[in-house]
Amino acid sequence: MQHRTRDLLIRQRTQSINAFRAHLAELGIVAAQGDAGVTELLAIVADEQDTRLPIDARASVIVLAAQLGALRTLIGSIEKRIKTQHRSNEVSQRVETIPGIGIIGATAIVATAADPTVFRSGRDFAAWIGLVPRQDSTGGKQKLGPISKQGDRYLRRIFVVGAIAVLRRAQENPGKYPWLTQLLARRPFKVVAVALDPDYARLAYA
């Protein structure tokens, strides 16, 4: 439940940041992408001596700034509880060792699939999440189609983001991930990421 709540709050925070940036951009006030840019814009709004922001406009964006602050606090509180639970859970600690998963991903996987015995195999677990190709039968032959995208969307996103993170590391440090580097040399980035997802799901199941 708390993972879903965190996910909702993060989406709300993203919407608030976009609105906050858009309001200020209309006045010619822009900053770099990422948290550093948002922090810079918040400082401008908080500084009543900054003449770039008219008084009336400041009153409006202060509301958005307050909303951002509240969302950050709520998200931080949830993440603190998640990390506390993770420290006392050996299973999620093992899952965290899977490259690209992290604490949030590990605890979400353990919380959502608390009883792995309901799955006959790692492939069944991957299929439950929606990470295995659809199988179509044509003329008596089995053909693998695209990823089904059925199942648990939240967990599927965790594995996809994790795979992308690992591939980016491989691009930055090819010598550390030789087999991924070879795959990336032969296949498009997204194709390799999708191919990794079921493998990571099987590792989590194990």
Task: Put a short name on every predicted segment.
Residues M1-A206:
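A detector of single, family-specific signature residues
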